[in-house]
Amino acid sequence: MTAVPKKISPQDGFFWKTKTLEEMSQAEWESLCDGCARCCLEKLEDEDSGRIYFTHVGCRLLDGDACACHDYANRSERVPDCVRLTPENVRTLSWLPPSCGYRLVAEGRDLYWWHPLISGDPNTVHDAGVSVRGRVEATETEVSVEDLEDHIVSWPALLPRRAKLKKRPG
């Protein structure tokens, strides 16, 4: 007797729709990162309101053109205040950008068309205008903490119009 063929679900292959954050393998977890590097921008917190302000100043390890860390494996040792994202903290980090794959999945939402897991192309995050490519004005080693206020920008906390589209613009 032959086995009854398994019915293919439209969810097959979309692990972020079927697994909890805690159930994901390390490779699956890492692949939720869309490569935008917005989380690698320096941020300021208003001590009175708790509001977070992004700057266009990158971490000293950020390659602003590649939108990647120069030393990802050792980032916590080299930058002690680098926040490692975990299934626990992505649910509470209010400064994660609205486009962040970790944030979207933690909130039970789907990934956007430009996310590499959807598009199959790591460049769509740049095509959609979501990444920091071309927008990092300096690194933290070039700007004093006292001067960070002069570098506050709003775009990292916003989703670009073309990124909101349901599918890749043609």
UniProtKB/Swiss-Prot annotation:
Pfam families: CxxCxxCC. Belongs to the UPF0260 family. HAMAP family: UPF0260 (MF_00676). NCBIfam families: PRK05170.1-5, PRK05170.2-5. This is UPF0260 protein RPB_3505. The lineage of its organism: Bacteria, Pseudomonadati, Pseudomonadota, Alphaproteobacteria, Hyphomicrobiales.
